[in-house]
């Protein structure tokens, strides 16, 4: 059966030749599961700072799989991306989140939303972009320079919580909406950070113009 397989750390240390195919639960009330990327020939794998797996295939483009290997985050092909070919020979991920794909028809790059992590979060390395956020901007607001699994809280100047979550790698993406999914009003918003262990990090500001 085609598809990715893995060798556990314990089996490596014991010089075992036992490989495992990862199963994804169907979550349909049954105990059934399906193999990850079953019958897909994987040629190369790269892992980003968020522990997501970028899998290049022989004729199916690139799959991005979540850190727990249970969710397909993205699937790039020649039909929905600038990939010149669906035959992927190699994938390289840079610390700034830029991903290079080597295909049999040439190179292609993609700016992902995950950057390398920082051990310490300081005012010198934690920042948001674009900043200010102008009225015609419709994309995500990215906070970078974070530690692994950092806790993020975005609050208004009067202390109202508008968004919270955890970083993926050294980055966090915010859609500019509050907890109810509404676009926030013009103003200054504070990004409060803390480490996975609960230690306070730094604060950066985002200016939004509607």
Over which residues does each language-model region extend?
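Glycine-centered tight-turn motifs at strand-turn-strand junctions
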Residues: 161-184, 195-199
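Glycine-centered coil/turn sites that cap beta-strands in beta-rich domains
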Residues: 120-153, 171-174
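Residue-level structural signal for beta-strand termini and adjacent loop
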Residues: 68, 167-168, 189
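Residue-level signal for WD-repeat beta-propeller blades
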Residues: 47, 56, 93, 101-102, ...
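Short, glycine-anchored, charge-dense loop/turn motifs used at functional sites
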Residues: 151-162, 181, 189
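Short, acidic, Ser/Thr-enriched surface-loop or helix-capping motifs
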Residues: 48, 94, 156, 178-179, ...
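C-terminal tail/sorting-segment detector
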Residues: 190-210
């Amino acid at each position: 059966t085609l598809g990715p397989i893995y060798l556990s750390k314990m089996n490596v240390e014991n010089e075992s030749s036992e490989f495992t195919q990862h199963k994804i639960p169907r979550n349909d009330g049954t105990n059934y599961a399906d193999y990850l990327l079953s019958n897909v020939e994987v040629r190369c794998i790269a892992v980003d700072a968020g522990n997501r797996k970028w899998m290049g295939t022989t004729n199916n483009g690139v799959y991005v799989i979540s850190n727990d290997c249970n969710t397909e985050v993205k699937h790039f092909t020649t039909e929905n991306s600038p990939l010149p070919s669906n035959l992927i020979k190699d994938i390289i991920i840079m610390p700034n989140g830029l991903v290079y794909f080597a295909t049999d028809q040439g190179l292609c790059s993609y700016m992902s939303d995950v950057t390398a992590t920082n051990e310490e979060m300081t005012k010198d390395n934690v920042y948001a972009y674009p900043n200010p956020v102008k009225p015609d901007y419709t994309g995500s607001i990215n906070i970078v320079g974070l530690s692994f699994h950092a806790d993020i809280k975005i609050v208004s100047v009067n202390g109202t919580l508008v968004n919270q979550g955890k970083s993926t790698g050294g980055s966090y993406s915010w859609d500019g909406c509050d907890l109810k999914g509404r676009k926030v009003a013009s103003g200054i918003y504070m990004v409060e950070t803390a480490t996975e262990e609960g230690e306070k990090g730094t604060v950066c500001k985002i200016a939004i113009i509607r």
